[in-house]
Every structure is written in structure tokens, then in C-alpha cells.
Amino acid sequence: MTQQLSNTNRVALLLQPYLTTQDLMAWYGRGKSWVGAKLREMHTALIKEGKKVLRGTISTAAFMRFEGIDLDEYVAKAKIEKELGI
């Protein structure tokens, strides 16, 4: 199991146009097999919507939609971490 990211690092990932398998492994703090299954699940949903997918990646916008992520929430958490020196 890999170490999970700080909110500051999560914000940096969410500002990228695409997330790779390695990015998702860091995000979830899980291994390649688990992340691969999660990515296949998201790809299947995207294909059903008529979208094209690229193996081993997902657009950050699609990832945020699937996970219900609000970028502003992570930015606020990152600011708090910075103030607390975490």
C-alpha cells in the first residue's frame, strides 16, 4: 500500500488535464491492481456515455465527476494544512 497524498499534492494533481495510473495510485493510496480495476470501472461508464478513453489514463474532469470531488474543498484543506505546517 502506498502513502496517501496531502491535500496540497491532491490539488496539484487535480490541476492536471489527465491522471495516470500512477497518479491514481498516489491519490487512493492503493496498489496497481486495485487502481486498474477502478479505472476500468470508470472507463466502462465513459464508453457507455459515448466518450473515448485512453488506456491507463482518465481526464481529471471525468475523475472528479465520478468521485464527487470539489476542487474548492481541496484548496481550502490545503490552505489549512499550510497554515498548520502539516
What function would you assign to each model-found segment?
Residues 3-7, 77, 86:
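Short recognition helix of helix-turn-helix/winged-helix DNA-binding domains
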Residues 11-34:
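Polyanion-binding surface elements
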Residues 1-2, 21, 39-40:
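A short alpha-helix capping/helix-coil boundary motif
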Residues 28-85:
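Major-groove DNA-recognition helix of helix-turn-helix-type DNA-binding domains
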Residues 1-16, 47-50:
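Short helix->loop/beta-hairpin flanking segments within DNA-binding domains
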